[in-house]
Amino acid sequence: MSLIKFYMRVASLESGQISPNEGMVGIVDDDSDISILFADALRGVDGGISVFTFNDSLEALKHFTNNKEKYILVICDLMMPGLNGLDLVKKIKKLSPKTRTMITSGYEIEPGELQIDIKKGIIDRIIQKPISMNGLRQEVKNQINSCQLRINKK
């Protein structure tokens, strides 16, 4: 596990930006180059977030379980040894339904393949790799804003 902590300019929800509340973002990919690249890309995300990278899904699940109230987003590769990405996000959503989840894959995902899991709210977004770092930052901003708006409505 690696911790990469960023503190950046904080914007208000009124401006449509990320809430000032700090939260954890987990990146889970068995390819360490991808997880580090994704973590580096998140330096451009407004707000204070702590980014944790994992190359082992079971290690990620253990960390999430111990910190579930702090996680706002988990980005997870679909195809991994051991516990695959879909099974990991199912466990994450069971532990913390409010945590947003994004599945990434370098393999082509057939239309409708994961639609049931999206409709059930298990997967919040599917990202096809490769993705530009600007595209990743925007997707993360969207997911974090969605999570914060949902929390603030309660």
What are these regions (language model features)?
Residues 53-73:
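Acidic, metal-coordinating helix/loop segments flanking the phosphotransfer/catalytic sites
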Residues 77:
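Active-site residues of response regulator receiver
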Residues 104-106:
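Hydrophobic/aromatic residues positioned on beta-strands within the core alpha/beta folds
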Residues 32-52:
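Two-component/phosphorelay signaling modules centered on CheY-like receiver
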Residues 80:
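Receiver (REC) domain active-site loop signature in two-component systems and cognate sites
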Residues 2, 128-140, 144:
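C-terminal output helix
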Residues 141-154:
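The C-terminal output helix
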